[in-house]
Amino acid sequence: KLVEVKKTPDIFAHLLAPLDLGFTALRNRVLMGSMHTGLEEMPDGFERQAKFFARRAKGGVGILVTGGISPNRAGRLAERASVMTEDLVESHRVITRAVHDEGGKIVLQLLHAGRYSRHAELVAPSAVRSRINPLAPRALGEDEILQTIEDFGTAAALAREAGYDGVEVMGSEGYFLNQFTAARTNQRTDGWGRSAENRRRLPVEVVGRVRKHCGPDFIIVYRISVLDLVEGGNSWPDVAALAKDVEVSGANILNTGIGWHESRVPTIAHMVPRGAFTWAIKRLKAEVAIPVVASNRINTPEQAEQLIADGQADMVSLARPLLADPDFVAKAASGASSKINTCIGCNQACLDNAFTGRLTTCMV
């Protein structure tokens, strides 16, 4: 059932408008972007994640994305990081039930870290080490690539069994699928490399396999890297072609990512102007028919409303702003946007903590 957030008429009419996906609808245009909270690996992590996400659903968020969960062991971020397995389905139901009880929707992010993994089994399209990881990956064989595609499909089916409304396939920020699409990291000479078309084959097949496993009434968000911001990254024609191909393959929504983790270009820090990358997201929106989500340095409902009203995007992704204030949407809807506890982009207790293995919190 679509639960509406109580709102004052004509305030943020575009931001708070429902979004029809055909088989289901989102109550507004706000997506809570994925962020690793550190709860994923804690003994009582599922119960604490349930409270965390349910609180944001109660605050009015239309659809939430979990922290990254790997589809297989090789793709996990660290030795003890989470993998989606059959024995965890009931535990994940604790999260989905809590969110649904508050009228929200939630999708599980499937994240294969590739060469960003911090364990001895890390794999990648080619044996090319990242400058931000002391560990070198092993290049996957053909059979392993095919198994990885199936692993994504199986993990998505388990997510559906656990009550998730869909999955987000993580294809940006320089992670595994992004590594396959870029010449920087994909030096293969077989059917998974050489040409741009071959390099984007893996994410396209992953989305198709997820759709095959989960059926037509399941949300598939594909997180696409709009700007890699690294040498040897994807060109704009490459990005546009990938967007079109994953749409055809079964994606319902395109969420956007800006910059690889190893990029030297700031993308979310305080000095980055608000909405600095919406020009690229508007360009992507012109290439596809499915909804496109704007991300990075969107901190206020006024800014979010304007970019949707101007046709730059169909939705907005808020991660840190919803860490700072879980009632961001409810306050905007009730005419109390001036009371929102606004994210200042300091990254000191969220991103810094995430990268040093501590619980994510907020300075504001």
PLM feature segments, named:
Residues 1-364:
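Flavin-dependent oxidoreductase catalytic cores
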